[in-house]
UniProtKB/Swiss-Prot annotation:
InterPro entries: Ig-like_dom, Ig-like_dom_sf, Ig-like_fold, Ig_V-set, IgV_Light_Chain
Region Complementarity-determining-2, annotated ranges: 75-81
Compartments it resides in: Secreted; Cell membrane
Taxonomic lineage from the root: Eukaryota, Metazoa, Chordata, Craniata, Vertebrata
GO biological process assignments: adaptive immune response; immune response
GO terms under cellular component: extracellular region; immunoglobulin complex; plasma membrane
Region feature Complementarity-determining-1, mapped onto this chain: 44-59
Record organism: Homo sapiens (Human)
Disulfide-bonded cysteines: C43-C113
Annotated segments matching region Framework-1: 21-43
Function: V region of the variable domain of immunoglobulin light chains that participates in the antigen recognition. Immunoglobulins, also known as antibodies, are membrane-bound or secreted glycoproteins produced by B lymphocytes. In the recognition phase of humoral immunity, the membrane-bound immunoglobulins serve as receptors which, upon binding of a specific antigen, trigger the clonal expansion and differentiation of B lymphocytes into immunoglobulins-secreting plasma cells.
Name used for this protein in its record: Immunoglobulin kappa variable 2D-26
Domain of life of the organism encoding this protein: Eukaryota
Keyword 4Fe-4S (UniProt): no
Domain Ig-like: 21-120
Length: 120
């Protein structure tokens, strides 16, 4: 019996007040995934997130219960301590991807990307 569940993406936007602010767009906004399948979500920034110090400050979070979010991936592709290796991050410049190779029931929740290359 196939039991679909939802992985929800959250569209993260800084309200633009000037043309220099970075706008983040995440797709898809939701996924129907069965445990064991692969999930993939993308995040695009309106400007390159490559900082002058050589790092790219792109993070992925999972939110299961408000207001608590769990850091999964930092600086594009580094797994935070304790995050299973089925989670992976990739990308550069303006385009980034989070993949979950074999989704487990505990993975369901709201995922979002965040940049820290520029303050809002």
């Amino acid at each position: 019996m196939r039991l679909p569940a939802q992985l929800l993406g959250l569209l993260m936007l800084w309200v633009p007040g000037s043309s220099a602010e970075i706008v983040m767009t995440q797709t898809p906004l939701s996924l129907s995934i069965t445990p064991g399948e692969q999930a993939s979500m993308s995040c695009r920034s309106s400007q390159s997130l490559l900082h002058s110090d050589g790092y790219t400050y792109l993070y992925w979070f999972l939110q299961k219960a408000r207001p608590v979010s769990t850091l999964l991936i930092y600086e594009v592709s580094n797994r935070f301590s304790g995050v299973p290796d089925r989670f992976s991050g990739s990308g550069s410049g303006t385009d980034f991807t989070l993949k979950i190779s074999r989704v487990e029931a505990e993975d369901f929740g709201v995922y979002y990307c965040m940049q820290d290359a520029q303050d809002p």
